[in-house]
Amino acid sequence: MITSAHIDDIRTQVRAWRAKGETVAFVPTMGNLHQGHITLVKEAASKCDHVVASIFVNPMQFGQNEDLDAYPRTLAADSEALTAAGAELLFTPTPTVMYPKGLEQQTYVEVPGISNVLCGASRPGHFRGVATIVCKLFNIVQPDVALFGNKDYQQLLVIKTMVEDLSLPIEIIGVDTIREDSGLAMSSRNGYLTAAEKAAAPALKQAIDAMAAGIKQGESFEQMTEQAKACLVAAGFTPDYLEIRHAHTLEQAQNQDHALVILAAAYIGKARLIDNLRFDR
């Protein structure tokens, strides 16, 4: 696998592949990789002739008092895992490469509406940072296909909306959430959990599953939401949000809606965990 922190190196290699008529898939990450990321890379390898990955802990998407400085950097292990999974080119830019004028003078991309609810309400500016860095990476790599995890459901919709609105010729593919045996969604932030917290953490998925089951049986949104929040609190979580939304727009779900998604974010110890369930009724 070729690794470079320089934009020109990435463009040169991709141009060489393009000159031979070959296709390119892209998997952007922040590093500290787990099996969920590796699944994205393997899926990417099945879609295109070549796979490009990136590792960049993006300061623009972290708010004040968030874990930018503490976010684990594990480049050597990540590189080994990416190579084994089929990545051929790894882009590892520094903040200076991506934001040479600094964050305050950086042009940014903002996807209105869908960016301002749920995680966007709890983390102001987060999705502006996500959309900006992903747009920049797309312009550098210019892939045919880009893959993202369904665990970050709102992020996936933000990116799909950006690609559609800006007429970018890229297919965005969401890949199913990879879970531990307990049902806990794999996340780089699971490393913040103590043993006791990790044992309690599967309650997040259990609460979401119970909500969906009740809704399918005709229970009210309000009743199932309150029950699920109570279960989370009993398990040691502090809920940030737990909501039922329209699966395509993230607008508040209405009783007549069929395509639904339950989205949750909750704190346990030092970790903020998110999860979701997309379903039809």
From Swiss-Prot:
GO terms for biological process: pantothenate biosynthetic process. The active site is at H37 (proton donor). ATP binds at residues 30-37, 149-152, 178, 186-189. Its EC number is 6.3.2.1. Keywords: ATP-binding, Cytoplasm, Ligase, Nucleotide-binding, Pantothenate biosynthesis. GO terms for cellular component: cytosol. Beta-alanine binds at Q61. It comes from Shewanella baltica (strain OS185). This is Pantothenate synthetase. Pathway: Cofactor biosynthesis; (R)-pantothenate biosynthesis; (R)-pantothenate from (R)-pantoate and beta-alanine: step 1/1. InterPro entries: Cyt_trans-like, Pantoate_ligase, Pantoate_ligase_C, Rossmann-like_a/b/a_fold. Belongs to the pantothenate synthetase family. Gene3D superfamilies: HUPs (3.40.50.620), Pantoate-beta-alanine ligase, C-terminal domain (3.30.1300.10). Homodimer. It catalyses: (R)-pantoate + beta-alanine + ATP = (R)-pantothenate + AMP + diphosphate + H(+).
